[in-house]
Amino acid sequence: MAIAYFIPDQAQLLARSYQQNGQQTAASPRTTATAAAPSQQQQQSQQQQQQQRHHHQQQRPQFRANISVPLGSQQGSMTMSEFGCWDLLAQIFCYALRIYSYSSSQRQPTVIQISFEISSGGQNNDEDDVTDATSKEN
């Protein structure tokens, strides 16, 4: 039986922490000196532009979910509905949509990329691998 580990609460907390950091940066007061020299005003405007660029970069939360699906020797006899991989992909996609459409006022075009990797768990598990087609000779 295949088991999938997916922790959506951590993903939601991650997205919210990025959003809260962005709101705190926007809410911080900026003071400017009225009697400052022109060179100081230019430096302050450059610093504000850099802060705005940095703030704009922080508004894009990036989220990565690592999902581990250990497959045993019984996986070959399981049907696709028993394995449930389509259900898992649908849950990941729907949850990603919820995270990125959290604030409808700042909604931007979003590309959601779901990728997966199939690899063996270890190098010494070749004897248990039912898909290994090579013959082993002593």
Swiss-Prot record:
Function: Activator of apoptosis, independent of rpr and hid, that acts on the effector Dredd.
Region listing for Disordered, in residue ranges: 21-71, 119-138
Oligomeric form and interacting partners: Interacts with Diap2 (via BIR2 domain).
Any one GO MF annotation of this record: protein homodimerization activity
Protein name (Swiss-Prot/TrEMBL): Cell death protein Grim
Domain of life per record: Eukaryota
Biased composition (Low complexity): 23-51
Species assigned in the record: Drosophila melanogaster
GO biological process: apoptotic process; apoptotic signaling pathway; determination of adult lifespan; larval central nervous system remodeling; melanization defense response; neuron apoptotic process; positive regulation of apoptotic process; positive regulation of release of cytochrome c from mitochondria
GO cellular component, one term: nucleus
Keywords: Apoptosis
